[in-house]
Amino acid sequence: MSQTNSHAQAGGTAKPIGLLIAAVGVVYGDIGTSPLYTLKEVFQGGYGVEVTHDAILGVLSLIFWSLIWVVSFKYMAFVLRADNQGEGGIMALMALARRASAKHPKLQMMMVVFGLFGAALFYGDSMITPAVSVLSAMEGLELAFDGLDHWIVPMALVVLVGLFLIQRHGTARIGVLFGPVMVVWFLVLGALGVYGIMQSPEVLKAVNPAWGLNFFIIHPGIGVAILGAVVLALTGAEALYADMGHFGRKPISRAWFILVLPALLLNYFGQGALVLGNPETVRNPFYLLAPSWALLPLIGLSTMATIIASQAVISGAFSMTLQAIQLGYIPRMHIQHTSSDAQGQIYIGAVNWALMVGVIMLVIGFESSGALASAYGVAVTGTMLCTTILVSTVMLMLWKWPPLLAVPLLICLLLVDGLFFAANVPKIFQGGAFPVLAGAVLFILMTTWKRGKHLLAERIDEGGLPLPIFIGSIRVQPPHRVQGTAVFLTARSDAVPHALLHNMLHNQVLHEQVVLLTVVYEDTPRVPSAQRFEVESYGEGFYRVILHFGFIDEPDVPAALALCHLAELDFSPMRTTYFLSRETVIPSKMDGMARWREALFAFMLKNANGNLRFFKLPFNRVIELGTQVEM
């Protein structure tokens, strides 16, 4: 997604066809590379499905109607409408659902749990997608050259490591190629599909849902389980919603119905026709669908497509991390902007290296796309289920849809998502434990950070000196005042910041203008400049300033304070000093969190990026004072 924000900013003036091509290059990379492995996994994934006429048509019918129901119906008709001021993605949706359930604290807490768990699974997906996609592309070399089996993993690792190494430099320059390359990819998918269908046109009968129902009848023991492989055709569906803020709902929908959906369906049916005529081709129906002379060019194109798909989820992880930081669920990290033109193009080193290590472990541990497919479905279906639950809350409590209309619809949506998720639960014991464990660890980290910050604020507030009493004492015994403005960052509005008390204690002076600054993040993506600040005067040169930012805004505090000249406050750069407080947590037996979580929070707090960099404060105008807090 880092390559997409330039499109977002130009979205108002970009030609529709250009925006559509750009959307194809970013939004549909993941779901567009699913034909590489989906049908092969159904018949080769150990489900016990025999390659028969009825089984092939049954599986194709399930794939067809899954794409129609989940993507064309659920996402296009409903999920994409649940935008948070134009922004999509599970964190934005969680903020929307949290706002919708504000009057019901228990329900609101449940929305946060589902949102955080869905986000945690997305990080697991961000590791699995590059691994399974690039491996599946490289596996085509086994058909082109004998004896290359042992080189597939090393070559995939070279491509993937190279992809992660270039992240810090940004992808703006090569990003302009993503759209055209993916358009060519989908055209090739469609052409190969038509080529296959022409050999066995009867495969088109699978459009009839009766074939899908018949599959469940003739395979009663594995009917639901096979949905765990069919769902691979839906991987990347969440990207349609996550990237909505970059392109808008209409370009994403048009790209789906005009190009992506027809190309995918043609290719799946073409693969089915190939296997119908020659069951032995089930070992790799995607590549065997191509004429022998086109195999090497197709491998090259597949590799480019999977790199683009991988780039999309990596950039998506960066974007979601930024949102989670702003919403207070992840410690602050160093965020590097990789483009001077597009504000949203970012790189987060800690996330990049963590993803790279995870991807390397997956490739070495699983060694093939087929083995990795079992891990894929759990992350995908878990995130989709969480999204549906959050959208349900928005439909009923924010949009105020009539229950008689909404409830039956939501039951159907949840039933289908629940079936897909249930089909993948057994995979937890067959390699699918990785995304679940990764999701559980990340969920613990996020909830520990959020709870820890809340407890830390409570401990700091205990015994705090009320601001009116402090200002009253200054009136009685005025301290020496020096020229300039002192800005003290604080989370509370009714108590004196510790940094201010320490400064008074050690320096015995006050600035002529003292500003108690609180930064507040809203549940909306952006806050207009006109609503950026609130100012309140307490007298004696004391002011309360509250700055409001959205969860995708860049929190540039000096720039925001410059707007306060409208309230006759002076924030001249060379006359303003920023005072920060740096807390060190000491775990104790006090009530709050388990000791191990307190220790974990203390470690996270110690290694978190400080306010100085995060708020873009000038290095030479900052004084940081430390304090120890028992928890």
Curated annotation (Swiss-Prot):
Q: Which residues cross the membrane?
A: 17-37, 56-76, 109-129, 147-167, 174-194, 215-235, 256-276, 288-308, 346-366, 378-398, 403-423, 428-448
Instruction: Please give the Gene Ontology molecular function terms for this protein.
Output: potassium ion transmembrane transporter activity; symporter activity
Which InterPro entries does the record cross-reference, listed alphabetically?
K+_transporter, K_trans_C, K_trans_N, Kup
Tell me the Pfam families matching this sequence. K_trans, K_trans_C
Membrane topology of this protein: Multi-pass membrane protein
Instruction: Work out whether the entry's keyword set contains Cell inner membrane.
Output: yes
**Electron transport among the record's keywords?**
no
Reaction it catalyzes: K(+)(in) + H(+)(in) = K(+)(out) + H(+)(out)
Give compartment(s): Cell inner membrane
Example GO CC term: the record gives: plasma membrane
Name the record gives this protein: Probable potassium transport system protein Kup
Q: Which UniProt keywords apply?
A: Cell inner membrane, Cell membrane, Ion transport, Membrane, Potassium, Potassium transport, Symport, Transmembrane, Transmembrane helix, Transport
- Name the family: Belongs to the HAK/KUP transporter (TC 2.A.72) family.
Task of the protein: Transport of potassium into the cell. Likely operates as a K(+):H(+) symporter.
Question: Which species is this UniProt entry from?
Answer: Pseudomonas syringae pv. tomato (strain ATCC BAA-871 / DC3000)
